[in-house]
Amino acid sequence: MYAVIKTGGKQYKVTEGDVLKVEKLNAEVNTTVELTEVLLVAGGDNAVKVGKPLVEGAKVVVEVLSQGKGPKVINFKYKPKKASHRKRGHRQLFTEVKVTSIIA
């Protein structure tokens, strides 16, 4: 059984046991979170349930494994022949989760 979920403005295809990095969730490590924005559920009874836009009563339960920061991305802008430049760095926050169950 698999599902397509939406979290942090992105969509992910998940199955039970998957470990993935999603945009930061406000949850403590080793807690469970229910993701209710389920767009599609398939498998199990060989039926595909497509939401309009969400599947009614479906949710995905995930366990928070860790919180962290991604790799540093450098943004450097400059103007040729001028003494003008700007350097900025950014590290995106993420949450690593493990899918424990898909409830449809």
Curated annotation (Swiss-Prot):
Single GO term (MF): rRNA binding
Presence of keyword Flavoprotein: no
Database matches in Pfam families: Ribosomal_L21p
GO CC terms: cytoplasm; ribonucleoprotein complex; ribosome
Family matches, as InterPro entries: bL21-like, bL21-like_sf, Ribosomal_bL21, Ribosomal_bL21_CS
Keyword terms, alphabetized: Ribonucleoprotein, Ribosomal protein, RNA-binding, rRNA-binding
GO BP, sorted A to Z: translation
UniProt superkingdom: Bacteria
Subunit: Part of the 50S ribosomal subunit. Contacts protein L20.
Family label: Belongs to the bacterial ribosomal protein bL21 family.
Matches recorded under PANTHER family: 50S RIBOSOMAL PROTEIN L21, LARGE RIBOSOMAL SUBUNIT PROTEIN BL21M
Entry function: This protein binds to 23S rRNA in the presence of protein L20.
The protein's name in its UniProt record: Large ribosomal subunit protein bL21
Organism of origin: Fusobacterium nucleatum subsp. nucleatum (strain ATCC 25586 / DSM 15643 / BCRC 10681 / CIP 101130 / JCM 8532 / KCTC 2640 / LMG 13131 / VPI 4355)
Gene: rplU
